[in-house]
Amino acid sequence: MTTKKRTASSTRWMQEHFDDHYVKLAQKRGLRSRAAFKLEEIQEKDHLIKQGMTVVDLGAAPGGWSQVAAKLTGDKGKVIACDILPMDPIVGVDFLQGDFREDKVLQALLERVGQDKVDVVLSDMAPNMSGSGAVDQPRAMYLVELALDMCHQVLTPNGCFAVKVFQGEGFDDYIKTVKQAFKVVKTRKPDSSRARSREVYLVATGYKL
């Protein structure tokens, strides 16, 4: 991508961002990001998170999903969040800053989970986009594979998984892999997801491995 094209694309994104209904609504409601509405829509349809549950939130910053999850789990629940970027504190959220791809960060996250089993694993992770599909798609698929591996390590039987996936090479095979681990797998495209985005969310329930 040339500098001129990148600048035009960035300018368009900024204009869309500030004109965006969900951005304005997030600001009005005191939510960290418009992404919070994606999880709210998924929750409304699939009822993944309940009071008292333990939730792991991968790719959490700036905290939109963690805010929603903490509210749903309540005082007796627990949200353990991780991101390579910093995140301001949220009541009820135990945040670990670090690169989830690194073993030492994974181990630190597993220590936060402890002996407890996790009820829900959430992943809104995405790589830094270069603009080249040949580069970005493999990076994105690597992250969702790591998120699924996290499920295998911490998820309770009949637990749930919601993960952002970009449609493209590896997408169909990934769905097949997720279906091997969960009883029900649905594809969601929340209204708050930008129409031109290739992102969709896989919502998997009934962990069976």
Curated annotation (Swiss-Prot):
InterPro entries: RNA_methyltr_RlmE, RNA_MeTrfase_FtsJ_dom, rRNA-MeTfrase_E, SAM-dependent_MTases_sf
Role, per record: Specifically methylates the uridine in position 2552 of 23S rRNA at the 2'-O position of the ribose in the fully assembled 50S ribosomal subunit.
Location of this chain's protein in the cell: Cytoplasm
Family as reported in the entry's similarity comment: Belongs to the class I-like SAM-binding methyltransferase superfamily. RNA methyltransferase RlmE family.
Cellular component per GO, a single term: cytoplasm
Active site: 164 (proton acceptor)
EC top class, as a word: transferase
Name listed for the protein in its UniProt record: Ribosomal RNA large subunit methyltransferase E
EC number: 2.1.1.166
Gene (name only): rlmE
Signal peptide: none
Principal location: cytoplasm
Keyword list, A-Z: Cytoplasm, Methyltransferase, rRNA processing, S-adenosyl-L-methionine, Transferase
Species per Swiss-Prot/TrEMBL record: Shewanella frigidimarina (strain NCIMB 400)
Residues annotated to bind S-adenosyl-L-methionine: 63, 65, 83, 99, 124
Reactions accelerated catalytically: uridine(2552) in 23S rRNA + S-adenosyl-L-methionine = 2'-O-methyluridine(2552) in 23S rRNA + S-adenosyl-L-homocysteine + H(+)
Gene3D superfamilies assigned: Vaccinia Virus protein VP39
Molecular functions (GO terms): rRNA (uridine-2'-O-)-methyltransferase activity
